[in-house]
Amino acid sequence: VINAPEQSSLDDLNLNQRAYEEIKHIKDTDQITIQVVNIGLPQKKAGVGLARKIGLDEAARWFKKLNHSGILVCFDGDCRCNDTYLAAIYNAYKNQNLNAGILAYEHPLDLESGIIPYELGLRYYTDGLRYSGYPSVHQTLGSCITINSDHYCKHGGMNTKKAGEDFYFLNKIVRKPGFA
């Protein structure tokens, strides 16, 4: 999902259009099919949560239409991964009784960007949950979510909150069987 609030600057809209054109060039190869959605979001609801919901809902609908369960993977435009990322996710689902999970992540540590305090805060959050004895410790980064499409539909999909949507979504599924 390539998205921007409806009242975005012309520069942002042009950047999105260029991204859309680039993705069209790589879509539908023999190994992967990509459905691209380029959409303006209502200003009041615009945010990564709504974009994530649109993408997940569309992918789940596509799998249902094919009468096939598939793997949904969240990934943000500013993320990076290695060449084996998708294969590792596929193998995890193939080799385990997996319905959903949180993928490992690591931000590139640029000393100038302030990412170190952010990364430490993320770790502090899960360490605090662990220390408190919370039964289901998990990170709440939306870009790290993966879920089986049938499981996604069964549990009502992503919500439309403008902030914290990944937190609330994960809390619905984290205690269900097959979460890793």
Features from the language model and the residues they span:
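Catalytic donor-sugar/metal-binding loop of nucleotide-sugar-dependent glycosyltransferases
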Residues: 161, 173-180
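Conserved donor NDP-sugar-binding/catalytic core segment of glycosyltransferases
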Residues: 84-117
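Alpha-helix termini
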Residues: 24-30, 58-69, 176
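Acidic donor-binding segment of Leloir-type glycosyltransferases
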Residues: 1-44
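A recurrent flexible, glycine/aromatic-enriched loop bordering the glycosyltransferase active site
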Residues: 126-146
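Glycine-rich, basic loop-to-helix element that forms the pyrophosphate-binding segment
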Residues: 41-64
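Acidic donor-binding loop at a coil-to-helix junction in glycosyltransferase catalytic cores
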Residues: 161-168
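Acidic donor-binding/catalytic loop of UDP-sugar-dependent glycosyltransferases
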Residues: 66-69, 75-92
